[in-house]
From Swiss-Prot:
<keyword id="KW-0732">Signal</keyword>
<dbReference type="GO" id="GO:0090729">
    <property type="term" value="F:toxin activity"/>
</dbReference>
<comment type="subunit">
    <text>Toxicity requires sequential binding and synergistic association of a class S and a class F component which form heterooligomeric complexes. HlgC (class S) associates with HlgB (class F) thus forming an CB toxin.</text>
</comment>
<dbReference type="Pfam" id="PF07968">
    <property type="entry name" value="Leukocidin"/>
</dbReference>
<comment type="function">
    <text>Toxin that seems to act by forming pores in the membrane of the cell. Has a hemolytic and a leucotoxic activity.</text>
</comment>
<keyword id="KW-0204">Cytolysis</keyword>
<dbReference type="GO" id="GO:0051715">
    <property type="term" value="P:cytolysis in another organism"/>
</dbReference>
<dbReference type="InterPro" id="IPR036435">
    <property type="entry name" value="Leukocidin/porin_MspA_sf"/>
</dbReference>
<dbReference type="InterPro" id="IPR016183">
    <property type="entry name" value="Leukocidin/Hemolysin_toxin"/>
</dbReference>
<keyword id="KW-0354">Hemolysis</keyword>
<comment type="similarity">
    <text>Belongs to the aerolysin family.</text>
</comment>
<keyword id="KW-0800">Toxin</keyword>
<feature type="signal peptide">
    <location>
        <begin position="1"/>
        <end position="29"/>
    </location>
</feature>
<keyword id="KW-0843">Virulence</keyword>
<dbReference type="GO" id="GO:0005576">
    <property type="term" value="C:extracellular region"/>
</dbReference>
<protein>
    <recommendedName>
        <fullName>Gamma-hemolysin component C</fullName>
    </recommendedName>
</protein>
<dbReference type="InterPro" id="IPR003963">
    <property type="entry name" value="Bi-component_toxin_staph"/>
</dbReference>
Length: 315
């Protein structure tokens, strides 16, 4: 279990002078206070919370940036969702058989944010559209008066008073928004296509990851070696997603948010078969979404007045 930590940073941004270098977040920032300009038109108050579940193989690192803007008639909160989701890829004998081996692997990683507070609304999030590139980099910017805008890359933040960026790698996977409304957003990072020794294969190919050693007794040997597996299958996924919410001022002191990290697992079977001449080979069989929503959900309470974050529950 990672030790919970709180990072508190207060920034003052003046309307009188433009920002030449807007402040970017730093997940490893130490406790400090930094003033930019004079006038205190904007106050950014930062908190960070870490939660780990060995049961689910997940670590949540959540940054809560409270935006206190005198020119905006609502409270605003930027939530940056980082951490690690282990792949939990495993190899085993299927139902204690000697000729069928199984590989359980993550077809999809799940990242979601949800609130049931009637005074809270989702107003922006990143990423928005389906993204197929290996490296994903986007920026969410804020300008005085409640104006949130997104930029396509880390370099596109020069005109913002304050900005928050995401950056992650998704080799052989694609990101897309699966569900979104005024109270929630759910992303899926899904297997796409893979380069193999026998050519490009779809993520739905029944022989995907099936190896070439039908005479081994070790289930691992029935599948391709680690060197042929992408990081999101071999190791896991480091998410970096952003959601921005607004809150009606004076309506309630606290709101609750549920943040979910997890995975949907496929199972590939490698079945030892023999030809008419007695030669052995491996035949693949696929079970899509054999285990779905293997998720770790943490409920966070946000205090809009004191800017405290409390963990209210987890599964």
């Amino acid at each position: 279990m990672l030790k919970n930590k709180i990072l508190a940073t207060t920034l003052s941004v003046s309307l009188l002078a433009p920002l030449a270098n807007p402040l970017l977040e730093n997940a490893k920032a130490a406790n400090d206070t930094e003033d930019i300009g004079k006038g205190s038109d904007i106050e950014i108050i930062k908190r960070t919370e870490d939660k780990t579940s060995n049961k689910w193989g997940v670590t949540q690192n959540i940054q809560f940036d409270f935006v206190k803007d005198k020119k905006y008639n609502k409270d605003a909160l930027i939530l940056k969702m980082q951490g690690f989701i282990s792949s939990r890829t495993t190899y085993y004998n299927y139902k204690k058989t000697n000729h069928v081996k199984a590989m359980r692997w993550p077809f999809q990683y799940n990242i979601g944010l949800k609130t049931n507070d009637k005074y809270v609304s989702l107003i922006n999030y990143l990423p928005k559209n389906k993204i197929e590139s290996t490296n994903v980099s986007q920026t969410l910017g804020y300008n005085i008066g409640g104006n949130f805008q997104s930029a396509p890359s880390l370099g596109g933040n020069g005109s913002f008073n304050y900005s928050k960026s995401i950056s992650y790698t998704q080799q052989n996977y694609v990101s897309e928004v699966e569900q979104q409304n005024s109270k929630s957003v759910l992303w899926g990072v899904k297997a796409n296509s893979f380069a193999t020794e026998s050519g490009q294969k779809s993520a739905f190919d029944s022989d995907l990851f099936v190896g070439y050693k039908p005479h081994s007794k070790d289930p691992r040997d029935y599948f391709v070696p680690d060197s042929e597996l992408p990081p999101l299958v071999q190791s896991g996924f480091n998410p970096s997603f952003i959601a921005t919410v607004s809150h009606e001022k004076g309506s309630s002191d606290t709101s609750e948010f549920e943040i979910t990290y997890g995975r949907n697992m496929d199972v590939t079977h490698a079945i030892k078969r023999s030809t008419h001449y007695g030669n052995s080979y491996l035949d693949g069989h696929r079970v899509h979404n054999a285990f779905v929503n293997r998720n770790y959900t943490v409920k966070y309470e946000v205090n809009w007045k004191t800017h405290e974050i409390k963990v209210k529950g987890q599964n």
